[in-house]
Structure formats: C-alpha cells, structure tokens
C-alpha cells in the first residue's frame, strides 16, 4: 500500500530516521533479533529471497519503474510503502539513494555454533585478520 510522505517526522519512519544499525539490531532487546535496513531493489530482492520478513519500505516516488515495480510485486499487498521525493530521501541519508529504495526487515535467528559445527565437514577459525 503506497503512502505518500512529505516530512520525516512521522512516527512510522522512526526506524529510518532515528535509529542507527546497532540500535536497529538491538531494538527488541532482550530479544536479540531486531531489524536491519536493506538499500536498493537488488539487495531488497535478495533479502526477500532469503525469507527475511519485510516490515515497511521507503521508496523514491520517481523510482516506481520497471525494476521497482517487479520488486513491489514480491511484497505483501498490506506492507506499508512510504513514498517521498528524492530531495526528502537525500536529506535523510545524506546521499542519493541507489535506485531510491530502503526496506526495513526483521532479522532472523542465526544458527548456533553447535549447529554449524554439527553440519560442517571442515571449519576454519581466523583471528586478527587485517
């Protein structure tokens, strides 16, 4: 569902406007899953294909084109998709967005070390890599 926005002070945009990556990842503490933001239709599509759950999207209103249209078709119809001008999005990020799209996703639980080791044939431990 497309929702036009004209300023960044709307509470629905908190995840995009007020929280950094660390704060997003810890948002549901003590539940360690949290959230992350994917940028660009290609990265968003990869996250969707990896079964991450989208929460909302922020999209440049001028980038609703073939690539974004294909992406929008992958998203649930009920997903809030906030649309804004390039100038407004640039004021948020400080730079021109690649293909004008950001998408908020829920993080998935990661495999435990025990599970990874149980499934692995060979394991490498790297330390102090520069």
What is the role of each PLM region?
Residues 66-78:
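Short, aromatic/basic amphipathic alpha-helical patches
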């Amino acid at each position: 569902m497309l929702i036009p926005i004209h300023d960044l002070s709307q509470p629905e945009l908190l995840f995009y406007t007020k929280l950094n990556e660390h704060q997003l990842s810890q948002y549901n503490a003590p539940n360690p899953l949290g959230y992350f933001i994917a940028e660009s239709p290609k990265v968003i599509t990869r996250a969707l294909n990896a079964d991450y759950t989208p929460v909302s999207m922020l999209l440049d209103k001028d980038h609703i084109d073939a690539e974004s249209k294909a992406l929008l078709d992958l998203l649930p119809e009920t997903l809030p998709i906030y649309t804004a001008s390039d100038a407004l999005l640039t004021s948020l990020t400080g730079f021109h967005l690649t293909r004008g799209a950001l998408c908020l996703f829920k993080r998935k639980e990661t495999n435990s070390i025990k599970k990874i080791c149980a499934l692995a044939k060979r394991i490498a431990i790297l330390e102090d890599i520069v």
